[in-house]
Amino acid sequence: MNKIIPLVILALFSTHSAAAANHIPLELDIGKPGDADKVSHTIKLTQVDNMFLPAEVRVKEGETIRLVIKNGGNHKHEMLIGSMAELKKVANMRRMYPDKEHAEAHLVQLEPGEQKELVWQFTTAGTVDFACPLPGHFKKMRGKIIVEKK
């Protein structure tokens, strides 16, 4: 009995550590949450029920951008920014656990007609993907943020 208790405790901590390892850090390869006082410009994106408009935007490396996202569709949508590999992983998780609530710094959740902002500093040149990872939305509701070198 005494040998089982340490094993149970170890199993609990191992599970927690594995979950924490899968949790996304505050600073990502795609940048980090930005300071609203340092926004260089605003980009407006509209979600309709099968796409983002525009589907591609350009920013400069190091810029802090205010993304204003409006859900112009008839269904709940999300906008998640990240690498395509991360977006696919999240979309798969949403299919497996559709009712689980999520709250990442690089995720915006919008009801129909709702508008929200995401202030982000794009720290590295390259391509940042965005998508609605909700079940049935991911294949069509995608876009790109091209981060150009300074």
Question: Where are the model-predicted features located?
Answer:
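Positively charged n-region of N-terminal signal peptides that target proteins for export
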Residues: 1-4
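Sec/Tat signal peptide C-region and signal peptidase I cleavage site
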Residues: 16-20
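N-terminal edge beta-strand
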Residues: 33-64
